[in-house]
């Protein structure tokens, strides 16, 4: 972390020499989203804020969804087996994609034959590891899908951070939190956690994992 901080500081200083009028953060931003600057993002996020803030407030005034069953005790070994199942559902070849455990989930790619993802198992929040696996699995599928002739070029590792995140969030949210996906996998989910979810319907589970709160973490 210290070395990354020093590199970031050096980049900000370097960029200030190139263009003293430019915001220092643009030096770092350009490393991840080439051609995008803070002025463009200010317009983008201002537009989002106008729609999202009232929406979140309106949802907050509605009756709260019961997600208490997600916070029962879920043994880690069962969560690990469930994570393996999710990787299988996603089509991740375990011969080319490993799964490890860490404090904060991340994906590490060496090439399109060796990508490794990690997750964190919360004893009292089964959705945490579930959606971390789907999220990091999305990153992994992107890396595993890069053509052989593009390996070790500037196009490997993702063309931008935004594009990479679009793939991970697609699997995590658009697929993983959809009613169709939950309905398809839920009988298997109940097999992994019969004591916790045996009397919980697929619709209840779907609503619980889509619960919106004013202040909530992105992942864990």
Language-model regions: role of each:
Residues 2-13, 218-219:
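Single conserved hydrophobic/aromatic residue that forms the stacking wall/gate
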Residues 143-166:
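Post-HEXXH active-site segment of zinc metalloproteases
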Residues 9-10, 14-126:
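Contiguous, non-catalytic segments that form substrate-binding/exosite surfaces or channel walls
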Residues 131-144, 165-169:
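Active-site recognition of the HExxH zinc-binding catalytic motif
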Residues 158-195:
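Post-HExxH zinc-binding segment in Zn-dependent metallohydrolases
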Residues 180-217:
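Long, amphipathic alpha-helical stalk/connector segments used for oligomerization, subunit docking
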Residues 61-62, 113, 145-152, 207-215:
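Short acidic (Asp/Glu) and glycine-rich catalytic loops that position anionic groups and cofactors
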Residues 35, 58-67, 147-153, 177-186:
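Inter-helical turn/loop segments and adjacent helix faces that build the functional surface
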């Amino acid at each position: 972390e210290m070395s990354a901080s020093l590199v970031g500081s050096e980049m900000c200083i370097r960029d200030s020499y190139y263009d003293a009028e430019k915001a220092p953060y643009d030096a770092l931003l350009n490393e991840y989203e080439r051609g995008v600057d803070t002025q463009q993002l200010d317009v983008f996020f201002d537009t989002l804020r106008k729609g999202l803030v009232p929406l979140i407030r309106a949802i907050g005034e509605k009756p709260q969804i019961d997600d208490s069953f997600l916070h029962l005790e879920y043994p880690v070994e069962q969560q690990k087996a469930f994570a393996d199942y999710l990787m299988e559902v996603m089509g991740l070849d375990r011969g080319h994609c490993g799964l490890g455990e860490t404090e904060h989930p991340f994906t590490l790619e060496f090439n399109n034959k060796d990508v490794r993802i990690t997750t964190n198992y919360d004893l009292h929040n089964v959705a945490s590891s579930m959606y971390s696996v789907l999220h990091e699995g999305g990153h992994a599928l992107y890396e595993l899908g890069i053509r052989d002739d593009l390996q070790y070029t500037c196009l490997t590792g993702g063309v931008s951070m935004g594009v990479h995140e679009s793939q991970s969030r697609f699997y995590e949210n658009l697929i993983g939190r959809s009613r169709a996906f939950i309905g398809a996998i839920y009988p298997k989910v109940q097999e992994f956690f019969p004591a916790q979810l045996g009397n919980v319907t697929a619709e209840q589970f779907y609503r619980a994992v889509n619960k919106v709160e004013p202040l909530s973490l992105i992942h864990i």
